[in-house]
Amino acid sequence: MRMEGENWVYEVRGIPDEFFQRSEGIPMTKREIRIISLSDLRIRPGMRVMDIGCGSGSMTVEISNIIGENGSVTGLDVSGEAADLTMRNCRNLCRFSNYRIVISDVYKYDSDEEFDAVFVGGGTARIHDLFERIERMVHHASRVVVNAIQIHTAYLSLEEMNTRGYSGVNITQVMVSNGMRTSEGYAMIARNPVFIISGDAP
């Protein structure tokens, strides 16, 4: 549990969920999923990263703190409320002013900027169209990581990566249970399983 006034000053990844401001109806990539997704994203200082469907901004914040002052992260969300929440969390938790938050539908987003890595935490309703957009954002060997809750989304993401010639394609299913204090001890409360799909763009 976060103590009032406590800041996250550690170098390890995975800021506890309670450090982030939340808003009802806006999803957040939970701590354990973030840790594995960040590992799969393979980012380093100086990289340019896109966070599609940034939601509460938990991944945007973590990415910002890894890539440092010479890197840049763009958080993209169709919801103005989500973009505002991401901005608030970035202001509170980012160590660098290397983030940019954009309100846009990913399918309409138009930019000439190339990214070294793309994380997809939302906006997965139209997977084929999504990968068409990603193809315009990346260069050879850019890293792409997709989080999915639905099996169908995971399957289609794998199909798109393999069809488009991605290398090192991998899928991991993560199932996490967290302890909840009860009158008699602790009970393990399960969260929804999440699929993490990753690969290198051709």
From Swiss-Prot:
Record field: catalytic activity: Co-precorrin-6B + S-adenosyl-L-methionine = Co-precorrin-7 + S-adenosyl-L-homocysteine + CO2
Any Gene Ontology biological process: anaerobic cobalamin biosynthetic process
InterPro entries attached here?
Answer: CbiT, Cbl_synth_MTase_CbiT, Cobalamin_biosynth_MTase, Methyltranfer_dom, SAM-dependent_MTases_sf
What residues bind S-adenosyl-L-methionine, as annotated?
29, 53-57, 77, 106
Which pathway, per its entry? Cofactor biosynthesis; adenosylcobalamin biosynthesis; cob(II)yrinate a,c-diamide from sirohydrochlorin (anaerobic route): step 8/10
Which class of enzymes does this protein belong to?
A: transferase
E.C. designation(s): 2.1.1.196
| UniProt entry keywords in alphabetical sequence | Cobalamin biosynthesis, Methyltransferase, S-adenosyl-L-methionine, Transferase
Asked if the Swiss-Prot or TrEMBL record annotates the protein with the keyword S-adenosyl-L-methionine, the reply is yes
Superkingdom of the source species: Archaea
Gene Ontology molecular functions: cobalt-precorrin-6B C5-methyltransferase activity; protein methyltransferase activity
Q: Which family does it belong to?
A: Belongs to the methyltransferase superfamily. Archaeal-type CbiT family.
What protein am I looking at?
A: Probable cobalt-precorrin-6B C(15)-methyltransferase (decarboxylating)
The record lists the organism as Thermoplasma acidophilum (strain ATCC 25905 / DSM 1728 / JCM 9062 / NBRC 15155 / AMRC-C165)
* Biological classification of the source: Archaea, Methanobacteriati, Thermoplasmatota, Thermoplasmata, Thermoplasmatales
